[in-house]
A protein has these predicted regions:
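Generic multipass alpha-helical transmembrane bundles of integral membrane proteins
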Residues: 73-196
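N-terminal topogenic module of multi-pass integral membrane proteins
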Residues: 1-119, 217-256
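C-terminal transmembrane helix-loop-helix hairpin of multi-pass membrane proteins
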Residues: 1, 149-156, 163-256
């Protein structure tokens, strides 16, 4: 949280405060695990793709083509299949196709949904990112995966730092694809891996996928950013809490 807060403040004038997401995630990876590329497991693929997505978002900062959102969604779906490839190869063809298509669709929807928030107020993206990260991390943690839970919670706390700056200053803080793309990729892949390798029930993913859509579609009152953020938080956190609750009903208590 603190690293993300500092990063958002430092890069605010350059309109790159969205780098707070990858900064908060990277420091969590450094502290929570001894990261190496070999063997290239699904969890390590999440880290690698998260870092690559941040770099890609930085390169695409000045590009505003409409077709780009669809291209990024397709790339996100392909990244999901690559991440869970080894696990899918151990399943029957029917299960492999079903899980592969489901994971690809989930990540693609998150990438598309978070990218659509770029056309709205930055407050919507920050609120959706906070709820999506906390919902994914909390559900993964309850679903018996402490490391995946830390990944999601790191995203949520980093987005919360971004949101806090807007609430305290009562001013919008630019997000950009450096915020939305890494968050969607990491949260999406974390959810997919938690479903396949842990005890996260698959039907929590559609609930989490509605968070960016809800933040995009909900009408906001014509009032201060603080009031608008409370409205967004109530809606998005309700969905995140629903995903965590459903996971708890299946998996039981949080593993110690």
């Amino acid at each position: 949280f603190l690293v993300a807060l500092i990063t958002a403040e430092l890069f605010q004038r350059m309109k790159l405060s969205g780098l707070a997401i990858i900064a908060g995630f990277a420091i969590t990876v450094y502290l929570a695990s001894n990261f190496t590329l070999e063997p290239l497991t699904a969890v390590r693929k999440i880290v690698l793709l998260g870092l690559c997505s941040a770099l890609l978002a930085l390169l695409l900062t000045l590009l505003q083509a409409r077709w780009l959102v669809w291209l990024l969604a397709i790339l996100g779906g392909a990244a999901a299949i690559w991440t869970v490839q080894r696990v899918l190869q151990q399943q029957t063809p029917q299960v492999m196709i079903l899980w592969g298509a489901g994971c690809a669709a989930y990540v693609a929807i998150l990438v598309w949904g978070m990218d659509k928030l770029l056309d709205q107020q930055p407050l919507r993206a920050a609120s959706a990112g906070t709820a999506l990260g906390i919902g994914t991390g909390g559900a993964a943690l309850v679903g018996a995966s402490a490391l995946l839970g830390q990944f999601g919670l790191a995203l949520g706390s980093a987005a919360a730092a971004h949101l806090l700056i807007q609430m305290v200053s009562n001013q919008s803080l630019s997000t950009g694809r450096t915020f939305t793309l890494p968050l969607a990729i990491i949260a999406g892949l974390t959810g997919c891996v938690a479903v396949i390798s842990a005890q996260l029930p698959w039907y929590t993913l559609p609930i989490l996928a509605t968070i960016p859509l809800a933040a995009w579609l909900v009408p906001l009152p014509h009032s201060s950013i603080r009031i608008q953020s409370l409205v967004l938080m109530l809606l998005t956190f309700f969905l995140a809490a629903g995903a965590i609750y459903l996971t708890w009903r299946v998996a039981g208590d949080v593993p110690l």
